[in-house]
Amino acid sequence: MCTAATYKTKDFYFGRTLDYEFSYGDEVTVTPRNFCFRFRHMSEVKTHYAMIGMAYVADDYPPYYDAVNEKGLGMAGLNFVGNAKYQDVQAGRENVAQFEFIPWILSQCATVLEARKVLEKMNLVGTPYSEKLPCASLHWMIADKDAAIVVECVEDGLHVYDNPVGVLTNNPPFPVQMFMLNNYMHVSPSQPENHFAKELPLATYSRGMGGLGLPGDLSSASRFAKVAFTKLHAISGESEAESVSQFFHILGSVEQQRGCCEVEPGKYEITIYTSCVNADKGIYYYTTYENHQIQAVDMHRENLDGDTLRRYPLVNEEQIRVVN
């Protein structure tokens, strides 16, 4: 289970939580422009846009969970179990394996509009990375500073949806998530007025009562509504520190604590990491469950004309600043 969001102040930000019961050994990974992408069904790509994101690098290949390229286009894959249905290889189409989807788009597209054009020719197939890394059931959000879309490959084919809220979680399918926001049209950051009955002297007794009815559980539909509301009402200054801090607060509204989401006896889903990328500057910020101090990797401090992945293991030890 995961949550992705966009946010815009002076710069454009893109990020997500990754919620699961264990980690594969994720690393912040920079793919430079001349790293050779060898695709399973398409020709290799030797020169492309550089990108930075979170990946589990296997056999010197970065299957990204989320990433942003040097042009400011971001993309994240989130669990879509039970609904994701990939296609068989088709002649005359650009056949892309599910685990290649993020590199395929970010290597060649600078904007959401360009990504839409690539998607028109693409066939998303269920080729697994390996026997040890089977196909993941995912859907994706792709976003730049001007637009966001959701891509879902289901039983009847590939669907692309405009995403006016810039948020994605998991099930149900995106159109249903958007429809269910109708349930919360009464929710407001302002204090409510008495519409129950004018003859009753009803009054607020606490701050925040305009938010009554906003869900607080950890289900994907509830997280979608909670983050959409939080993001659309969040106010931030335009500095980098203020913007990044506010982005982490937005996604912090749906963090999962160990013990609150049991997936099987004795195993619990937690927010393994939360990311926030300044897509304009190529800086990848993150926190982990064990370490709340924000870490940062700047892709532009790397040799982006190189041909070798740059990998940064996550800093997982809690950083506590003692002030006396």
Task: For the regions a language model picked out, list residue spans one by one.
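Proteins synthesized as precursors that undergo proteolytic processing into mature forms
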Residues: 92-128, 240-248
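Catalytic cofactor-binding cores of redox enzymes
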Residues: 121-159
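Broad, structure-driven detector of short, well-ordered beta-strand segments within folded domains
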Residues: 68, 149-153, 275
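C-terminus-biased signal that marks the final domain/tail of proteins
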Residues: 1-13, 127-130, 135-136, 145-147, ...
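Short, surface-exposed beta-strand-loop junctions and turns on beta-sheet-rich folds
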Residues: 20-22, 81-83, 156-159, 166, ...
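Beta-strand residues in well-ordered beta-sheet regions across diverse protein folds
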Residues: 15, 76-77, 152, 161, ...
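A contiguous strand-loop segment
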Residues: 1-93, 126, 311-315, 322-324
